[in-house]
Regions:
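Core catalytic lobe of class I
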Residues: 4-103
Length: 103
């Protein structure tokens, strides 16, 4: 059993691959930000004083498709969940509502 990353009398937060640690399955609600399945490459381009600056970040593990998201939701079942994702990929089966967050 893994210890929560943070816990108080109202909430327990776990940090890690939820397919390896299953303590979260006993929770009342699931709030998760799984890999979106968009193949994010972690490269950004900005211009500073007329010079193009490219920055690279590591790839996100499991972001090639939505299999991580789909595995988690299959384990979770029909219980309440808030799942962050991308409009670029099909919604998971059983979605009742969606909220658009325009950053």
């Amino acid at each position: 059993m893994v210890a929560p990353y943070y816990a108080d009398e109202y909430v327990s937060l776990y940090l890690g691959d939820c397919r390896e640690h299953t303590e979260w399955l006993g929770c009342d609600v699931l709030v998760t930000d799984p890999p979106y399945g968009i193949g994010w490459r972690g490269v950004s381009t900005t211009y500073r004083r007329g010079v193009c600056v490219r920055r690279s970040s590591p790839e996100i593990a499991g972001d090639r498709d939505t299999s991580v998201r789909d595995e988690v939701l299959a384990l979770w079942g029909e219980r309440p969940a808030m799942v962050f994702g991308s409009w670029r990929r099909p919604r998971p089966a059983g979605v009742r509502h969606r909220l658009i967050w325009d950053k």
